[in-house]
Amino acid sequence: MSKVVSKMKSFLGFDEFEDEDEVMEEEEVMEEEESFAPVLSSKKNGKVVNIHTANTAKLMITKPLVYDDATEICTALKNRKIVVINTTSLELRTAQRLIDFVGGACYALCGELQEVEKGVFIVSPSNVEVSNELKSELSNKGMFNWASK
């Protein structure tokens, strides 16, 4: 009769002993969990970057004497330099051809070409924004607001 009672207890889950296979599996699971513990090191491998070198803008001021100087200007623009071009020493037709050539290169490189004064131009690459607010303000009001009220 005790066999019947023990079978009934084991069937209902009230048996007093554990299966050896279950004990071994639980130990293996615990060992696996312990083996995956994170390893923390006190040494940090941080990368130090100088933030001031990334935004260094270079400016080139040129006064071309011949049309062939346009290639030098376009190379500087391609290297992301801001170029100020003074064409006052060139003939009008040569200056116009030079500005047309530089303007085409500027368009191809997504840059910007603006006239600062008569015969003086600024060419900026795509990563530089040139504001023209002062020029429009000066043309409307003049340098000083001397108008009497």
From Swiss-Prot:
Sequence intervals crossing the membrane: none
Entry keyword annotation includes Repressor: no
GO biological process: division septum assembly; FtsZ-dependent cytokinesis
Compartments in which it is found: Cytoplasm
A GO cellular component entry from the record: cytoplasm
InterPro entries documented for this protein: Cell_div_SepF (IPR023052), Cell_div_SepF/SepF-rel (IPR007561), SepF-like_sf (IPR038594)
Keywords: Cell cycle, Cell division, Cytoplasm, Septation
Assembly description: Homodimer. Interacts with FtsZ.
Record family assignment: Belongs to the SepF family.
Protein name (Swiss-Prot/TrEMBL): Cell division protein SepF
Organism lineage: Bacteria, Bacillati, Bacillota, Clostridia, Eubacteriales
Gene: sepF
